[in-house]
């Protein structure tokens, strides 16, 4: 392994890749150690008869974040990936046989909702869209893009916008806000679904996070190479900038000497001297002492949050039979409480809502006979398997889809299923949560760990770190970590 290294990045997830690129672009010598056999972290794929199927994130928004990383390496995303803009955000289905497509175009959405639920609900959507636009404008620069949530900037951005104040009331949830806007429960259910995009339940997630709608409506892209292909492309351009990657290299300990990071030890016994370390993993791994006492002590002032949602994920190849699928699809339960009630109690949902990514649809290419699918059923975090887990999950997934007109041939095999317990083992310290800490609670956004820790030279990146979950957020966290590291080096040199 590299003996002359300025920075060791632990983990080649999206946050780690962005951090490595940011540090290397500034001229630092960077080594990435990754326990797995490929980059991507949660953005991974499994082999199927139809080709590699994503079994992690599938939605790419805020594309400017990705573009900036390729630009830092002197290239363009289009030279490495086939990025396809999707005019249709998703196709939504309900048990009563109704369905609704939503788009990136506001007027198209208004007309679709008018045909779906009538003039009053179309007008309600226009008001909701206007409100969330204002929330996005107020919170994007002051929270999402900022290295630390800036209360003064939030106040300055909202004090002159009284129309936003009701959505900022402490204790008001997304479910409350949406019930005020929409009389049709299907629309309240649909837009409440965005709470799950950051790992929360709509009945407990702050109303302000309704702004997530704007992250999608501003643009969604499909990637022909898959989300795992995005990670592979970022790793390639990072290597071209001089970053060295070591796969199958599990970090064992972050070494402290004289109050700062001096090395990272690998389980094989190799020690990599360095001046700084960026940890791209769940912060819970540090709190649990999995990287040594020095790393654990660095998190003493950062209390462990409640975990976000986990999921049961099917990834497989098959031929679909029945309803016409888009790239992104949501099959809703008739009663959201039969989903979120059990999840809140730590149980598998009785009647889940199911997200399906039909990875070969809307890709500007013929749809193959064997298509690739990812099906996500939200669930509670936890490291222990559920009783009869595979059978229970199968029974609550495919009969529901069949009742709504969708079947697959052949049925997915057991090995196609990823469980919360498996996610917990794969991502130490996470308890199987796939969105970091829970977004539920008024102050959850302000309690996420920031890039700097209590140990000089140790920084954090990833979905468990500010600004939170999702591919663009994880990438942003990596950029924050690299910038914090560089700023500290400049300060120390003065």
UniProtKB/Swiss-Prot annotation:
Reaction(s) the record says it catalyses:
rhodopin + A = (3E)-3,4-didehydrorhodopin + AH2
Q: What EC number(s) are associated with this protein in UniProt?
A: 1.3.99.27
Q: Which GO terms describe its biological process?
A: carotenoid biosynthetic process; chlorophyll biosynthetic process; photosynthesis
Query: Looking at its record, which EC class is this enzyme?
Result: oxidoreductase
Q: Which UniProt keywords apply?
A: Carotenoid biosynthesis, Chlorophyll biosynthesis, Oxidoreductase, Photosynthesis
GO MF, one example? oxidoreductase activity, acting on the CH-CH group of donors
UniProt pathway annotation:
Carotenoid biosynthesis; spheroidene biosynthesis
Claim: Oxidoreductase is one of the keywords in the record = yes
Family membership, please give it.
Belongs to the carotenoid/retinoid oxidoreductase family.
* PANTHER family recorded: 4,4'-DIAPONEUROSPORENE OXYGENASE (PTHR43734:SF7), PHYTOENE DESATURASE (PTHR43734)
| Name of the molecule in the record | Hydroxyneurosporene desaturase
| Organism expressing this protein natively | Rhodobacter capsulatus (strain ATCC BAA-309 / NBRC 16581 / SB1003)
Originating gene: crtD
């Amino acid at each position: 392994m590299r003996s002359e290294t300025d920075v060791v990045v632990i983990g080649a997830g999206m946050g780690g890749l962005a951090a490595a690129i940011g540090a290397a672009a500034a001229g630092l010598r960077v080594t990435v150690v990754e326990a797995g056999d490929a980059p991507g972290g949660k953005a991974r794929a499994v082999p199927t008869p139809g080709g590699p199927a994503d079994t992690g994130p599938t939605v790419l928004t805020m594309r400017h974040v990705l573009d900036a990383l390729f630009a830092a390496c002197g290239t363009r995303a289009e030279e490495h990936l086939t990025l396809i803009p999707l005019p249709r955000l998703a196709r939504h289905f309900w048990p009563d046989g109704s369905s609704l497509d939503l788009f990136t175009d506001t007027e198209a959405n208004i007309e679709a909702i008018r045909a779906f639920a009538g003039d009053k609900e179309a007008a309600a959507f226009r008001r909701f869209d206007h409100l969330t636009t204002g929330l996005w404008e107020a919170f994007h620069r002051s929270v999402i893009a900022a290295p630390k949530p800036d209360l003064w900037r939030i106040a300055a951005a909202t004090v002159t916008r009284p129309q936003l104040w009701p959505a900022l009331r402490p204790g008001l949830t997304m479910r409350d806000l949406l019930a005020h806007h929409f009389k049709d429960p299907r629309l309240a259910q649909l837009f409440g679904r965005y709470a799950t995009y950051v790992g929360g339940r709509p009945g407990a997630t702050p109303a302000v996070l309704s702004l997530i709608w704007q992250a999608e409506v501003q643009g969604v892209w499909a990637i022909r190479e898959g989300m795992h292909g995005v990670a592979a492309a970022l790793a390639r351009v990072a290597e071209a900038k001089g970053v060295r990657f070591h796969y199958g290299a599990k970090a064992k300990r972050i070494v402290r000497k004289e109050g700062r990071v001096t090395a990272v030890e690998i389980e094989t016994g190799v020690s990599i001297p360095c001046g700084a370390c960026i940890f791209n993993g769940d912060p819970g791994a540090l709190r649990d002492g999995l990287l040594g006492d020095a790393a654990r002590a660095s998190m003493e002032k950062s209390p462990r949050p409640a975990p976000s949602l986990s999921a049961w994920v099917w990834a497989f190849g098959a031929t679909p039979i029945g309803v016409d699928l888009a790239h992104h699809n949501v099959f809703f339960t008739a009663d959201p409480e039969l989903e979120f009630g059990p999840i809140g109690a730590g149980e598998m949902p009785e009647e889940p809502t199911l997200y399906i990514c039909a990875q070969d649809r809307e890709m500007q290419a013929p749809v193959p006979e064997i298509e690739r699918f990812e099906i996500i059923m939200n669930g509670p975090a936890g490291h222990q398997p559920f009783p009869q887990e595979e059978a229970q999950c199968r029974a609550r997934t495919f009969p529901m889809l069949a009742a709504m007109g969708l079947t697959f041939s052949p049925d997915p095999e057991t090995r196609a299923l990823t469980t919360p317990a498996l996610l917990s083992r794969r991502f130490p310290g996470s308890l199987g949560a796939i969105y970091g800490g829970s977004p539920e609670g008024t102050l959850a956004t302000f309690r996420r760990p920031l890039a700097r820790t209590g140990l000089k030279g140790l920084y954090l990146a990833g979905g468990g770190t500010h600004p939170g979950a999702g591919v663009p957020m994880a990438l942003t966290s990596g950029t924050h970590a690299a910038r914090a590291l560089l700023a500290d080096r400049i300060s120390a040199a003065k």
